[in-house]
Amino acid sequence: MGEPIRVLVTGAAGQIAYSLLYSIAKGDVFGKEQPLVLVLLDITPMMTVLEGVVMELQDCALPLLREVIPTDKEEVAFKDLDIAILVGSMPRREGMERKDLLKANVKIFKSQGAALDKYAKKTVKVVVVGNPANTNCLIASKSAPSIPKENFSCLTRLDHNRAKSQIALKLGVTSNDVKNVIIWGNHSSTQYPDVNHAKVNVKGKEVGVYEAIKDDSWLKGDFILTVQQRGAAVIKARKLSSAMSAAKAICDHVRDIWFGTPAGEFVSMGVISDGNSYGVPEDLLYSFPVVIKDKTWKFVEGLPINDFSREKMDLTAKELTEEKETAVEFLSSA
């Protein structure tokens, strides 16, 4: 066993973290040989709840978990980190405009970005989950100029997994049989789930999803809407936002950063758009298809984009540009 790595989870007393921490601590993400120190950050009023989470983690008696550090202080939380998973954000309250939500979160992610810049390792990998995830991630990155912007990514893997699962359900196969779906753009209802390049294994034969499903109107209509609105559907049914599925998606996302993507497969994650070949404006945190090797992601290049896709990709880029402009305005005054 090597040296322990330091992993931070923010919003650590919350729903998603409760599903996530056990998976990380038992080795599902960084492997069964990698010891770790878990650092748990939350706001001061949540410290008592967080103590309960720490007790439970201790009571799991997990061999890889060397230490658990609960804190409400950024200088403790961000010190010498290898990985930061930023789950905590200001939730949208009833009657709250998206603009108000952005303003509250710019403040949080400016502060956390600055703390990463000051205290974390320069090689730290930062994954932003708290919504609006793409723009929060961009703000954190801009507030941490000494950390490469390629080290920042945001979670669209939940949308990616939702898309895989809908295709699998439609065809009566397992999600494992579906690969190379793409989520383009924002983790919002403008995201574009694209299966033009996706493949499915049907009775041992790999075929394109359009060819396998033979229902273009579903693929261009209800399928896209279902994935775009899935989060809202879960809230409506459960009265709480997705936690178990979000935690699983975070594990998938971070494991792929750590160990790389399987040969012949690509995944979706929100990354900085600089240098992309898909006509997405620079300096946006936009979800693309990527492959990962040696902890470094690269865009999947050369995928043909039809007019239907182009329109959807531009629409979500427009929303992200507007979000960014609003956030950057707040950033200068935060």
Swiss-Prot record:
It holds the Pfam family Ldh_1_N. Signal peptide: none annotated. Substrate binds at residues 92, 98, 131, 162. One of its GO terms (cellular component) is extracellular space. The active site is at 187 (proton acceptor). It catalyses: (S)-malate + NAD(+) = oxaloacetate + NADH + H(+); (S)-2-hydroxyglutarate + NAD(+) = 2-oxoglutarate + NADH + H(+). GO terms for molecular function: L-malate dehydrogenase (NAD+) activity. It is found in: Cytoplasm, Cytosol. GO terms for biological process: gluconeogenesis; malate metabolic process; tricarboxylic acid cycle. NAD(+) binds at residues 11-17, 105, 112, 129-131. CDD domains: MDH_cytoplasmic_cytosolic. Its EC number is 1.1.1.37. Its main location: cytoplasm. Keywords: Cytoplasm, NAD, Oxidoreductase, Tricarboxylic acid cycle. Homodimer. Belongs to the LDH/MDH superfamily. MDH type 2 family. HAMAP family: Malate_dehydrog_2. Catalyzes the reduction of aromatic alpha-keto acids in the presence of NADH. Plays essential roles in the malate-aspartate shuttle and the tricarboxylic acid cycle, important in mitochondrial NADH supply for oxidative phosphorylation. Catalyzes the reduction of 2-oxoglutarate to 2-hydroxyglutarate, leading to elevated reactive oxygen species (ROS). This is Malate dehydrogenase, cytoplasmic. It comes from Gallus gallus (Chicken). The lineage of its organism: Eukaryota, Metazoa, Chordata, Craniata, Vertebrata. The gene is MDH1.
